[in-house]
Design a protein with these regions (language model features):
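Hydrophobic/aromatic beta-strand patches that form the interior of the parallel beta-sheet core
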Residues: 214, 232-234
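Walker B catalytic acidic pair
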Residues: 189-191
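Structural recognition of the conserved hydrophobic beta-strand(s) that form the central parallel beta-sheet
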Residues: 212-218
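Conserved NTPase motor "head" modules and their coupling/switch loops across ABC/AAA+ ATPases, GTPases
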Residues: 42-185, 194-198, 202-210, 221-230, ...
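Extended, charged alpha-helical "arm/stalk" segments used for dimerization and assembly
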Residues: 1-32
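Secondary-structure edge/capping motif, primarily at the C-terminal ends of alpha-helices
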Residues: 33-40
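A structural signal for well-ordered alpha-helices, especially hydrophobic packing surfaces
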Residues: 29, 33, 62-65
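Hydrophobic positions in the central parallel beta-sheet of the AAA+
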Residues: 184-187, 215
Length: 247
């Protein structure tokens, strides 16, 4: 979910602002639901009335956010599947699934998402009143990755996890490059130390094709030798006043 929001904020104009409005409405609504647990009668009805516009804002911004996520997944999924085949050719095809209580179709519009979301709010209103927090909305949704028809989350080996992370990274770079006409600046933190030689080669090849990348490592030995030879290196040293870049 966090990955989708991060990529969508760079891929779609206005997505980040929509997400910010949604999160604000969610905080306000959850506060009111919690307050309602402490009162009853007229006071509880007053809180329900105060909560109504926040619910409407959640439906509006939430449906726009879900539609944005679905559009992103539709564009990202085939690219991700292709990059995963490059990184892990021995593994079965990778599939991406959007998981939600509302069971959205991959091509649903924002208005269709809003209809489903409004129905979910109606269905969970009583339970929310007992539990004191919002039970539906895109903040509850998730993504599942299937390899060979099975969800890899419960059983993925470290190798499978690394393959998926690299494939996601490469797919994100491809998608953003196609959208904006130029590649993003790549930031990698200690990415090489746990990669096997094959995955290192894939990562080095991708980095070499980018105009600019910033990579951190605890030791130069953790980086691919060919990459170090082409890079401008800086060492961070601990001094009396904290860490600093060595001259």
């Amino acid at each position: 979910r966090g990955l989708l929001d991060r990529v969508a904020s760079q891929w779609q104009r206005g997505y980040e602002a929509t997400l910010t409005r949604y999160e604000r409405a969610l905080r306000q609504r959850n506060r009111l639901l919690k307050d309602a647990l402490e009162v009853d009668g007229a006071a509880r009805r007053a809180i329900a009335s105060e909560m109504r516009p926040w619910t409407e804002m959640l439906i509006t911004t939430g449906s726009e956010g879900v539609a944005g996520r679905l559009a992103l997944l539709a564009a990202l999924a085939p690219v991700l599947s292709a990059t995963h085949r490059e990184v892990a050719p021995s593994e079965a095809g990778l599939e991406t699934h959007y998981l939600s209580r509302e069971e959205y179709r991959p091509d649903e519009s924002a208005s269709e998402c809003a209809t489903r979301l409004a129905q979910s709010f109606d269905q969970t209103a009583e339970t929310e009143g007992y539990q004191g927090y919002t039970l539906v909305g895109p903040h509850r949704d998730d993504i599942a990755f299937h390899v060979g028809g099975s969800d890899i989350a419960p059983t993925a080996s470290r190798g499978q996890q690394r393959s998926l992370l690299l494939a996601l990274l490469f797919a994100e770079i491809t998608l953003l490059t196609d959208e904006h006409g130029h590649p993003p600046v790549l930031l990698l933190d200690d990415a090489f130390s746990e990669l096997d030689p094959q995955r290192r080669e894939h990562l080095v090849a991708r980095i070499a094709a980018l105009p600019q990348s910033i990579i951190t490592a605890t030791a130069l030995e953790d980086l691919a030798p060919g990459l170090v030879a082409k890079a401008t290196s800086r060492e961070i040293q601990r001094g009396p006043h904290g860490s600093a870049v060595a001259a």
